[in-house]
Amino acid sequence: MTTNTVSRKVAWLRVVTLAVAAFIFNTTEFVPVGLLSDIAQSFHMQTAQVGIMLTIYAWVVALMSLPFMLMTSQVERRKLLICLFVVFIASHVLSFLSWSFTVLVISRIGVAFAHAIFWSITASLAIRMAPAGKRAQALSLIATGTALAMVLGLPLGRIVGQYFGWRMTFFAIGIGALITLLCLIKLLPLLPSEHSGSLKSLPLLFRRPALMSIYLLTVVVVTAHYTAYSYIEPFVQNIAGFSANFATALLLLLGGAGIIGSVIFGKLGNQYASTLVSTAIALLLVCLALLLPAANSEIHLGVLSIFWGIAMMIIGLGMQVKVLALAPDATDVAMALFSGIFNIGIGAGALVGNQVSLHWSMSMIGYVGAVPAFAALIWSIIIFRRWPVTLEEQTQ
């Protein structure tokens, strides 16, 4: 049974299942941002020291995305999803049992291995299973799962960590992953690998200047975002001087705004992806530059977080659309590279935020993040004028 012979309802149900999986994976990626203080207290460490866990996770994903994708390029996709979920669940059990920070980091590396494969195939699978003419909407739905991880997963994980301990947060994610795995087994058809590419695809992709320019833009803008975002929880409490509950509410606002960004992109992304992305980068730049000035008011921080969340969702979606449009003949290789490069940016941003917090002042993370954001804005304007491309231009 192929995705072309099923009803639109079933096709959408499969995309929704992938969106739920995206929610699970992004919850576990984002949730340490809201648990840094609790984990640091548990292991008698500084918050900034624990933050290095974010960089390790992201750079493992970056390093392994392409090798794992190539190793599994001929594996049937349903089977591959099941296997990576098993690794994902087992790693969360180890996170729950972690008796030292080192063991916790090892467990997170296991999660990162599963993450590396998942995000290299998910976008292309969503497009493949979507009803005809609904590819942008399918991507938007996957992104909504990502946004919900921030609006629900991250704050809920933080609340669970506050009241039951951070270990229970990881245990709960593991249980959620198990339920999602059972749904995947029931709902997904056999999905033979296609358009996955191989090592032979790499020279071809590297000879596409538009694609390489998108990759460069991705790493710079993601570095800018995560320089500040990685430490937003301790920033709100230690620099702004607001309560832990407000920090949770702020994360809720930022994530919820991502859903707004997803809706905007779903409606306008096909025709105006380039304009949307450049505008969103400009908005990110403003938010980062105003982070410290806004720290004197809960209302100011709340409004800022809404625009910040909208900007990052549009940026993330726009980058995916352009990568898929520029590499329709090797989508999995291109997306594995994208996932790796995105995580290089996450790790770099978390590391920059770590170093700024340890050796300068955590109050400066917004200003420091604004520097690469400005560079990203200029670069986006240059490349989108030279290589305009929309999802409609994909090879069918």
UniProtKB/Swiss-Prot annotation:
Keyword Transport found: yes
Protein's name according to its UniProt entry: Probable sugar efflux transporter
Main location: membrane
Gene Ontology, cellular component aspect: plasma membrane
Stretches that traverse the bilayer: 15-35, 50-70, 81-101, 103-123, 136-156, 170-190, 209-229, 246-266, 275-295, 299-319, 333-353, 364-384
Cell compartments where the protein resides: Cell inner membrane
InterPro entries: MFS, MFS_dom, MFS_Efflux_Transporters, MFS_trans_sf, Sugar_effux_transptr_put
Family assignment from sequence similarity: Belongs to the major facilitator superfamily. SotB (TC 2.A.1.2) family.
One function term, GO molecular function aspect: carbohydrate transmembrane transporter activity
HAMAP family: MFS_SotB (MF_00517)
Keywords linked to the UniProt accession: Cell inner membrane, Cell membrane, Membrane, Sugar transport, Transmembrane, Transmembrane helix, Transport
Claim: Transcription regulation is one of the keywords in the record: no
Topology class, membrane: Multi-pass membrane protein
Protein purpose: Involved in the efflux of sugars. The physiological role may be the reduction of the intracellular concentration of toxic sugars or sugar metabolites.
